[in-house]
Amino acid sequence: MKQEGKFILMNREELKVYIEGLKGCKTFTSIQQHHTASPAYKDVKNNNIQLMKSMENYHVKNLKMSEIAQHFSTFPDGTICVGRPLTKDGGGFLSPLNKNSITIENVGNFDIDLMTEEQKQSIVFLNALLCKKFNIIPSTSTLIYHTWVQNKSCPGTKWFGGNTKAAAEKYFIPLVKQSLEDMSFEEALKIVSDKSGVNYDYWKLRKDIEPNFKGLIIKIAKAFGGV
């Protein structure tokens, strides 16, 4: 983890702890998916926080915003940076649809750049964490691509199989749903392990050899009052 002012650069595990610990956030009902276009991959040189500062400078000076527009940015190396606080709506890009909407700017030009596997994993993980935190059900009504509401290609034609609603339903949204399911299972596994006194690794091993084990563990954890 690295912090300069409000900008906090984290890996996925650090991000999970950060988001789960947030208090006093406003209510959010949707998450916007954007690419930066500029900066693109060619502009990323181990300078992630500096890129955040440069984006904020552009948003304030050129777009007349009060601060950086996005709540989060993801980077090719898989790190995620906090920008605008979650006590505020996202800024600028899709006004008036910014109301109760989280803005994610993913660094890259995904009309051209081929997204790294690390960034893919972080984008899916971040969206799943936010859906879990704010009780958002992943769908094309809640995970919104910029191109669906304005005449732009953003978040890019190479974004998770394409930037259409059909592509989102086929490629992106199932990944977010699977990530949410995996999070619920991991939480349930810890609850059942704690309550049963049986080693966590034993339950994980059974998951790999028994069909429908995930659903069973989640049901048991709910009976214990968890998940």
Give names to the regions the model predicted.
Residues 42-57, 226-227:
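Surface-exposed flexible segments
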Residues 1-38, 42-43, 76-91, 95-187:
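Basic/polar, cationic surfaces and motifs that engage anionic cell-wall
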Residues 68-69:
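Short loop/turn microsegments at loop-to-beta-strand junctions
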Residues 180-227:
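Short, solvent-exposed alpha-helical surface patches in non-cytosolic proteins
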